[in-house]
Amino acid sequence: MIGDGVAFAEDVTGSGAIFVWGQATWSWDDSDPGARRLAAVQVVSTGVCRQRDVADAFGVNETTVWRWREEYADGGIGALLPIRHGPKRPTKLTEAKVAEIRTLRTAGKTIAEVAAMTGVSTFSVRRAIGPARPVTQRDARTPSTLSDGGEVPPVPLVPLVPLAKPIERNAERAAASSGLLDEAAPVICEGSSLPLVGSLLILPALAATGLLDAAAVVFGAGRKVGGLHRSAFYGLRSLVLCVVFSCLVSEPRAEGMTRLDPIAIGRLLGLDRAPEVKRLRFRMAELASEHRADELGMELARTHVAARPEAVGLFYIDGHVRAYHGGAEVGKAHVARIRLAMPAEVDTWVTDRFGDGLLVWQSAPGASLAGELKLTVDKIRTLLGPDARPTLCFDRGGWSPKLFAQLVLSGFDILTYRKYAKHAEPRSAFVDHEFIDDLGHTQHYLLADRTVRVPYDSNRRRFTCRQIVRLDEASGHQTQILTTRDDPDPALVAHAMFSRWRVENFFRYMRAHYGLDALDAYETVPDDPDRLVVNPAKRKAVRHAIEAAHSIASSEADRGRASFERLDANEALVDAYAGAQAELGVRKAAAKTIPAKVPLSVVRPDAVRIDVERKRIMDAIRMATYNAESSLARLLAPHYARAEDEARSLLREAFKTPADLEIRGSTLHVRLDPLSAPRRTRAIAGLCEELNATKTIYPGTDLLLVYSVKGT
């Protein structure tokens, strides 16, 4: 019963009827879906049943019944008939037509000429000249299913061509050079055991970062130079994905393309080959000339914040020094990892609580981390809005109690190590705490928790905050942490501070695999000539005065000062001593007259800085790729017991693994070869199931990606 006196009956074939007080009022059979929909419409329109009850009985959403009623009111019963999908006429690519196309292509005709001579489109020509397989058999294949319901291709009836070469795109290159093509569309090269095709595993996670969408929003689709559209074979999509895939196979620099097979990378892009190094650099220079790299970074950050709100309540801020080995007059910075001051540029990086990259910019010369925190506050506030109260975590380089007070007033919490640590806490003040981190590990801390007041402005003011001290029982060392967070569990705060190593791991991994220190461009820009720098003449004069003072002190220690002041002292010795004292006075006076700082133009008139516009674009692409890899590593964890230690190494192996590519209807099947060990193969197979659930479309097409591993 679906209402008072109203009954719904339908058999397994789909035929049914609706009875009103025992009378069969509406009926339909399984071959007439229009009559079935009409019955649903009329039983609601006559008021004998509620729309919700009818929807439940017919097994559809209530909105669907409402839509049927609207369609019936507008177009009558004809509007209720289902629209027939699929081909409207027989395919033009008969076996005879395919043979004719291949004959003309073999004779040297271009794709456009073959299309004109045979009366089909250029797309049909490309399909026809692909690897020869009987069309009827290919269309007759039926997909099997995975355990979760996703489709996975069966063993092909006709084997794919091993190491198949992509279709040559010479006609499109000629069209691009003639100004007739905005961007070459991707054409998938089907085949088996294609090298590096495992890199396509990154696409679902890369789509979540919004990289391609952000690049299109900032720079526009296709190719633009000075705001004007230009023709191109390699569009923005191809350029960005080229950098992504080269990073995944451990060649993050542009010159690394010379060490990769251009055809293998071209297959990943849906093209016949990847751009050459010269072309890639030239096109990246065009993008850099737009001076919109910071906009790209902010667009990616907005997507990251929206997609992962659980990761953006805590931010880690740190600087990274990139050593410079060129011949330009670049300023020096201290490179901590080699304990040496040398020409270098300093970047400020912001990561989320899991260590994934969020923002990066070039630091001002000589700027401290405390100074960079002021820029960080503005950028994060722009991302999170005025009501959020995030936590900024940094090391002792950002120490400034005055700045801490300003940050708190601006709606931020701070978390840092205490500089100039005070007296140690007594052993009785420490309490044992346990904390379960995001990886499920139990952390044990001995912590002392109390409120302190930190002086600043020459002890005229005090900054009140919370101090959490960790005791290492083995060594007796105490680590003092300052924060304005009021979490009831001090172990949570301590763990957040100690998790700052994630930033160091980020730097280390990016240096090793993503070209963090890559120069990317040789262009330089003039340094600020009015910027005040240390005066080397002042330093030299002070050193001379110190040398004179040391000489006098050495003589006094050798002979005794009294020996120079005795009445019977050697006259020549006394005169020498007096002369040395006079020389010391002269040198001190000279040092005082020399200014401590002078404009940069006085000291180093040729000083320059590295132009980082192109590098910032490359960094944005690399950072998004790293974040996508991090997402895959997290998805891999339930499927691989050693994921905590080996997830990224397993992913790098998978990225370089050969795979089959096959188009089946509207799906693109990616079947990876087995990996180096059965457990690693099973782990990647589990990852494939996770990725299939995302329903990701290959960029630039309407093909749904379906991943699997052979033999699983």
Describe each region flagged by the PLM.
Residues 15, 174-181, 405, 409-503, ...:
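An anionic, glycine-rich sequence signature occurring as long contiguous blocks
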Residues 52-58, 113-115:
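Short alpha-helical "recognition helix" segments of helix-turn-helix
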Residues 33-49, 94-108, 240-248:
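Short, amphipathic alpha-helical "recognition" segments used to contact nucleic acids or chromatin
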Residues 77-90, 133-160, 292-299:
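Short Lys/Arg-enriched helix C-cap and helix-to-coil transition segments
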Residues 11-19, 24-32, 37, 147-340, ...:
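Dynamic "connector" segments at or just before major functional cores
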Residues 61-64, 121, 276-280:
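Short coil turns linking two alpha-helices in DNA-binding domains
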Residues 40, 101, 205, 242-243, ...:
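Short, conserved catalytic/metal-binding motifs centered on acidic residues
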